[in-house]
């Protein structure tokens, strides 16, 4: 639901302690909980309103304190409230809504920050590695840390716990799968760029296999053995192991020797009928990050004043043989749901962040739309299944802001024409040159399904680890 609505939030907080809801499979959710489209003409009395009736009973009936069989966690990397609003305004219009991101009935906000490695003091602007470590392990750490605390000690993550409890596990991203967010479920290294043996020897020597460590992110991933991992990052698999049983072999050859099935396009992905510990699945659909959905000009100094308004265009490099985030999400659910013990699946829309860094509004908007479509797939499964908790949030906030179209802003700006036909000016103003930076504002977190009420109110990023662990009843 939209971030400005206090109604559902206050109801959720007050009713989280009420008795059990109807049995999950028998529950019929009120459609008004999910449909947040403006109800009429925006210029008319009440036309912009998104809620027409009292939702108390509907929200009460949506609550369940049962344990979840499955959890689907969807992360919009860099998807702060500003990024959601930018994308909604452009792609859906002022009165529109995202049928996934905006449709989860229980909403809260969480704090996120990392720690300085030497002092342990708060670092109020986290990177994606420390933030992913926070929700995957329940431990705050330093920027750059993957699955380790400020003392470089590893902590068991949600995927490892889910496996230990007999659940199927999945990890989907539009980034390189060695990138920070997916990597936090796959490995424990002291620096986030230790994708393969080469970087690990230089940047994470204590983790390198030749030094007695557990290996690079990719090498640890192959040992961790999740059932389904889909995304980019094929280039690292060409590197060669320097030590251990597979010394001298490429990481791809090692994966094949360990029994993994590797697919590289949509048709090959569609052909997969099962993925489990006997034959886990790896989908590698790009050498690095996967191509973005939409293209447009990057913002420039006074671009909103000196350049014409633009509309975003489809990226010709995102060809039909490359699966979308929604397609990868659907396939992962299809394969994981066969486990009678349930599953844990993390899905990341990675390039909201990457395009925000590049001050490219069309890039980040398209990736937000992509994530919304993935959320819709997860939500549809959860509604039909009745035993699945869906959570949608972000790892950190970012730099894009909506400003008045005529403003002479000090940063980089670009003017877009929205679905409404109105001008939308986007500003990136926290870096003089080069990459725009993360910001430290609290983030929206929203949920649907068993124990969804635990995301309401103010929580911390580390609470997400405990919320999921409790919902799935994961034991050490």
Swiss-Prot record:
The keyword Cell cycle is assigned to this record: no
Residues with Phosphoserine modification: 128, 206
Molecular functions per Gene Ontology: alkaline phosphatase activity; metal ion binding
UniProt entry keywords in alphabetical sequence: Hydrolase, Magnesium, Metal-binding, Periplasm, Phosphoprotein, Secreted, Signal, Zinc
Catalytic reaction annotation: a phosphate monoester + H2O = an alcohol + phosphate
Residues binding Zn(2+) 1: 353, 357, 438
Subcellular location as annotated: Secreted; Periplasm
SMART domains for this protein: alkPPc
EC number of this enzyme: 3.1.3.1
Record-listed Mg(2+) binding positions: 77, 179, 181, 346
Function of the protein: Has only phosphomonoesterase activity.
Protein name per its UniProtKB record: Alkaline phosphatase H
Protein's organism: Pseudomonas aeruginosa (strain UCBPP-PA14)
Gene behind the chain: phoA
């Amino acid at each position: 639901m939209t971030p400005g609505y206090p109604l559902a939030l206050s109801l959720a907080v007050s009713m989280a302690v009420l008795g059990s809801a109807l049995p999950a499979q028998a529950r019929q959710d009120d459609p008004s909980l999910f449909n947040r489209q403006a109800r009429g003409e925006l210029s008319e009395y009440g036309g912009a309103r998104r809620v027409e009736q009292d939702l108390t009973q509907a929200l009460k009936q949506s609550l369940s304190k049962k344990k979840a069989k499955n959890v689907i966690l969807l992360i919009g990397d860099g998807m702060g409230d500003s990024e959601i609003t930018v994308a909604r305004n452009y792609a859906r219009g002022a009165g529109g809504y995202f049928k996934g991101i905006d449709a989860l009935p229980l909403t809260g906000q969480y704090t996120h920050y990392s720690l300085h490695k030497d002092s342990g003091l708060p670092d109020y602007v986290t990177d994606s590695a420390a933030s992913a470590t926070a929700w995957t392990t329940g431990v705050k750490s330093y920027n750059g840390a993957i699955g380790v605390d400020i003392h470089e000690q590893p902590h068991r993550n949600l995927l490892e716990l889910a496996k230990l409890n007999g659940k199927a596990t999945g990890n989907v991203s539009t980034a390189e799968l060695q990138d920070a967010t997916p990597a936090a479920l796959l490995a424990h290294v002291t620096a986030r760029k230790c994708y393969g043996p080469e970087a690990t020897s230089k940047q994470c020597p204590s983790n390198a296999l030749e030094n007695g460590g557990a290996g690079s992110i990719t090498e640890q991933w192959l040992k961790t053995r999740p059932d389904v991992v889909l995304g980019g990052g094929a280039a690292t698999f060409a590197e060669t192991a320097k030590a251990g049983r597979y010394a001298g072999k490429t990481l791809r050859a090692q994966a094949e020797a360990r029994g993994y099935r590797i697919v590289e396009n949509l048709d090959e992905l569609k052909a997969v009928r099962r993925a489990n510990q006997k034959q886990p699945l790896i989908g590698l659909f790009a050498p690095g990050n996967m191509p973005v959905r939409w293209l447009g000009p990057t913002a420039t100094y006074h671009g909103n004043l000196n350049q014409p308004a633009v509309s975003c265009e489809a990226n010709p490099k995102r060809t039909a043989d490359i699966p979308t985030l929604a397609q990868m999400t659907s396939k992962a659910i299809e394969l994981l749901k066969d486990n009678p013990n349930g599953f844990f699946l993390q899905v990341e829309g990675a390039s909201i962040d990457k395009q925000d860094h590049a001050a490219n509004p069309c890039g980040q908007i398209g990736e937000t739309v992509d994530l919304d479509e993935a959320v819709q797939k997860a939500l549809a499964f959860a509604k039909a299944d009745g035993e699945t908790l869906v959570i949608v949030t972000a790892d950190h906030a970012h730099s894009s802001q909506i400003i008045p179209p005529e403003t002479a802003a000090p940063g980089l700006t670009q003017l877009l024409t929205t679905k409404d036909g109105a001008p939308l000016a986007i500003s990136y103003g926290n870096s003089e040159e080069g990459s725009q930076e993360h910001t430290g504002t609290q983030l929206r977190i929203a949920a649907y399904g068993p124990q969804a009420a635990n995301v309401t109110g103010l929580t911390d990023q580390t609470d997400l680890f405990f919320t999921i662990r409790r919902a799935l009843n994961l034991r050490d």
